[in-house]
């Protein structure tokens, strides 16, 4: 017999006074259903407000009748008292009725001439739900004040927030009080603290990165939609470096509307949430969050209070934007430290950098990973004194702060990365061993304790600090950039980031494991490269969870081979870059462009030629020990590929083998093997190059980069 209970809209729970209200488990509602809930909540809120106004008017009328009786009794004794009491009664009636009418969002009697312009835009927002707010979801007449349910719906954010300040009801962006100017109220209340109203969130997924300059100079943004510009002007701060920038001209309104609709649709699919200072209620099944957790946090942190979800609470200080976002000098592009598909990296000071992502989903993933790593590493191993408070845990770089408004995360600053490091000497081989052991330990920790696969192990994502007195010596190394990271399959539907800034909860996407989206094409592990060449739609072969870690360590072996070539080639770094590395990256760009354009066959063809360059790297560094690698790869290509693709593979392999000769590295390899640290790195590279087929991923990861 099916249950007669039905799910109802959480925002419309006005008639119940149940303590500790918790929403029933809900299936993922559609956008139409959630919008219907919003309309029902608005109607119920309006009806409750009218009832509250009528009840208040009735009480005042009854009080007026009682006072009239008293006046009649006193009229025989003192005639002047009648006028006094009647006047006081009328004033009281006017005050209460005015307050009740004001709570019902009828504010014509307190409108000023300066408010007429905001009235037109407020009419549209009055259709949004305004409900009485108590921790127990009581009736409209209960409680000592009203909560206003504010719907923030812009091109890049859709959330609902309660504002409360005594007898204040929030409508749209400002807090209105009886007879006050809405433009004078520029602060909201959440979590018991005053918070300034923020400018609207600008999506960098569809606009170029903003240029901001210190000292209050206007920044440059693309033109947004009319509502976004209006909200920007209303919520701007009149003075200081945080002035809202004026939009650029030149973009059509139709294109802007299309972008806004697409962005809001995607955001609608992600979350729809209601929050106040007592509870954060989300559309995620059975999930409610406690905003009081933010009071004890200074960095993103995993709070394992629920066995069903991995909640990372992301706090934000009130003055974060003024201390971080507006303090970054973007006036000169020469200051920029890095740029790529993820966004841009700019220096903040000597010890910190700011990463401005192009997609908000990447920022959400970064802070969730940061909280997970920081919490799991806290009980595993004590940090070195030099890394305390820097956000580096177990060789993994984490974010120490986040701003969804500007799509910004704050990280520790390193000297350079391993790709741009140009000082390689055999005398510092011990520091190279420590660096790669740290990276291998970070990968094992990330897979075993955090159950997350990085999927982007490249020299560009390995940050290093060098000895200023000896630039060839690597002091410390850390793995960064989690834009391609995915949790293990058993973490699907469980990973959530909760933001204090917006009072919302954002779910981390489930793992997809499409091989074409995993790893840089030039550093992809050879077993996965072969699977992608045969089938561009292939996914990660999940026959066992140990395959994830083996794949990651195999990619780290490719990075090690990349660095060993720079270290051992007697021709020098310039020749290696113009010859060997140019061949390795020759078809990587074509593979990425084909993937962006949806030409998967062209992508697999480019990966086939990259496989030839990877094979040449191994054959050059290993010499006769690399013969098995070459023969196995050639047999695979001849058995799986067409004759024309085989000819193209052989032709490019011949070109690579002419440039990557073992004679160029033979003498330095002998010197490398004469040291214990060099022998360790050489054997580690040999073991990773032995992972050449899918079955090799079932090996023991402890044999790779052993401690």
Curated annotation (Swiss-Prot):
The keyword Transferase applies. It catalyses: L-seryl-[protein] + ATP = O-phospho-L-seryl-[protein] + ADP + H(+); L-threonyl-[protein] + ATP = O-phospho-L-threonyl-[protein] + ADP + H(+). One of its GO terms (cellular component) is virion component. Autophosphorylates on serine and threonine residues. Residues 1-14, 178-188 have a biased composition (Low complexity). ATP binds at residues 337-345, 359. It comes from the Viruses. GO terms for molecular function: ATP binding; protein serine kinase activity; protein serine/threonine kinase activity. InterPro entries: Herpes_UL97 (IPR010615), Kinase-like_dom_sf (IPR011009), Tyr_kinase_AS (IPR008266). It is found in: Virion. It is an enzyme of class 2 (transferase). The active site is at 456 (proton acceptor). GO terms for biological process: symbiont-mediated perturbation of host cell cycle progression; viral process. Its main location: virion. Its EC number is 2.7.11.1. Keywords: ATP-binding, Host-virus interaction, Kinase, Modulation of host cell cycle by virus, Nucleotide-binding, Transferase, Virion. Residues 115-127 have a biased composition (Basic and acidic residues). Residues 1-32, 115-146, 176-199, 231-264 are annotated as: Disordered. Serine/threonine protein kinase that plays important roles in several processes including nuclear viral egress, viral replication or regulation of host cell cycle progression. Participates in the acquisition of tegument during virion morphogenesis in the nucleus. Redistributes the host nuclear lamina by phosphorylating cellular Lamins-A/C. Plays a role in viral DNA synthesis by phosphorylating the DNA polymerase processivity factor UL44. Stimulates host cell cycle to support viral DNA synthesis by phosphorylating host retinoblastoma/RB1 protein. Belongs to the protein kinase superfamily. Tyr protein kinase family. HCMV ganciclovir subfamily. Interacts with UL83. Phosphorylates and thereby activates the antiviral nucleoside analog ganciclovir used to treat CMV infections. Phosphorylation transform the drug to a toxic form, that leads to successful suppression of the infection, while the uninfected cell does not have this ability because it lacks the viral kinase. Mutations in phosphotransferase may induce CMV resistance to antiviral therapies in immunocompromised patients. This is Serine/threonine protein kinase UL97. The gene is UL97.
């Amino acid at each position: 017999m099916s249950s007669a209970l039905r799910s109802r809209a959480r925002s419309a729970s006005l008639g119940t006074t149940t303590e500790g209200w918790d929403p029933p488990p809900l299936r993922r509602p559609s956008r139409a259903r959630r919008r219907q809930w919003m309309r029902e909540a608005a109607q119920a809120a309006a009806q409750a407000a009218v009832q509250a106004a009528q009840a208040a008017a009735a009480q005042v009328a009854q009080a007026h009748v009682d006072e009239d009786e008293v006046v009649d009794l006193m009229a025989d004794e003192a005639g002047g008292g009648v006028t006094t009491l009647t006047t006081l009664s009328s004033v009281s009636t006017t005050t209460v009725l005015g307050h009740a009418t004001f709570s019902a969002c009828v504010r014509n009697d307190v409108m000023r001439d300066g408010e007429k312009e905001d009235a037109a835009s407020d009419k549209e927002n009055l259709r949004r739900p305004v409900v009485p707010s108590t921790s127990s979801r009581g009736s409209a007449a209960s409680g000592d004040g009203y909560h206003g349910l504010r719907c923030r719906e812009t091109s890049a954010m859709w959330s609902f927030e309660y504002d409360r300040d005594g007898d204040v009801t929030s409508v749209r962006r400002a807090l209105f009080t009886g007879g006050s100017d809405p433009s004078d109220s520029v602060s909201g209340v959440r979590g018991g603290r005053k918070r300034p109203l923020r400018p609207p969130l600008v999506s960098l997924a569809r606009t170029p990165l903003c240029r901001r300059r210190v000292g209050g100079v206007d920044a440059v943004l693309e033109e947004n939609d009319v509502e976004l510009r209006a909200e920007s002007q209303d919520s701007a701060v009149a003075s200081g470096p945080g002035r809202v920038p004026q939009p650029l001209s030149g973009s059509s309104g139709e294109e802007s509307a299309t972008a806004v609709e697409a962005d809001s649709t995607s955001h609608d699919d992600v979350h729809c949430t209601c929050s106040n200072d007592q509870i954060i209620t989300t559309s995620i099944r059975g999930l409610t969050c406690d905003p009081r957790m933010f009071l004890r946090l200074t960095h993103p942190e995993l709070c394992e209070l629920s066995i069903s979800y991995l909640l990372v609470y992301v706090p934000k200080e009130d003055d974060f934007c003024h201390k971080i976002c507006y303090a970054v000098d973007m006036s000169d592009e020469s200051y920029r430290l890095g740029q790529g598909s993820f966004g841009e990296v700019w220096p903040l000071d000597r010890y910190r950098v700011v990463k401005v992502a192009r997609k908000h989903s990447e920022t959400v993933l970064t802070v969730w990973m940061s909280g997970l790593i920081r919490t799991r590493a806290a009980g595993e191993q004590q940090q070195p004194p030099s890394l305390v408070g820097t956000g580096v845990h177990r060789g993994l770089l984490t974010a120490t702060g986040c701003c969804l408004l500007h799509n910004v995360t704050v990280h520790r600053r390193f000297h350079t990365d391993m790709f741009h490091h140009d000082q390689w000497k055999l005398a510092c081989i011990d520091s190279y061993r420590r660096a790669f052991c740290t990276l291998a330990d970070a990968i094992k920790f990330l897979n075993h304790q955090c159950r997350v696969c990085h999927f982007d192990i490249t020299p560009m994502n390995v940050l290093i600090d060098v000895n200023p007195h000896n630039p060839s010596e690597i002091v410390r190394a850390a793995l960064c950039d989690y834009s391609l990271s995915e949790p293990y399959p058993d973490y699907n539907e469980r990973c959530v980031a909760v933001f204090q800034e917006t009072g919302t909860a954002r779910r981390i996407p489930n793992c997809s494991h499409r091989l074409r989206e995993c790893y840089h094409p030039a550093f992809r592990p050879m077993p996965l490269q072969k699977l992608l060449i045969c089938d561009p739609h292939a996914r990660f072969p999940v026959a066992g969870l140990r395959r994830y870690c083996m794949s990651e360590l195999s990619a780290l072996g490719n990075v090690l081979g990349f660095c060993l070539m720079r270290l051992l080639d007697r021709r020098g770094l310039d020749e290696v870059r113009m010859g060997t590395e140019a061949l390795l990256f020759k078809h990587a760009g074509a593979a990425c462009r084909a993937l962006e354009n949806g030409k998967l066959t062209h992508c697999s063809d480019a990966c086939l030629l990259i496989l030839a360059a990877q094979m040449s790297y191994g054959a050059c560094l290993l010499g006769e020990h690399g013969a098995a690698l070459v023969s196995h790869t050639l047999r695979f290509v001849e058995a799986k590929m067409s004759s024309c693709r085989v000819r193209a593979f052989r032709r490019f392999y011949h070109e690579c083998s002419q440039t990557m000769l073992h004679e160029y590295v033979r003498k330095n390899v002998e010197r490398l093997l004469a040291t214990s640290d060099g022998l360790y790195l050489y054997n580690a590279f040999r073991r990773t190059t032995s992972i050449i087929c899918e079955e090799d991923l079932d090996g023991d990861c402890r044999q790779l980069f052993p401690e």
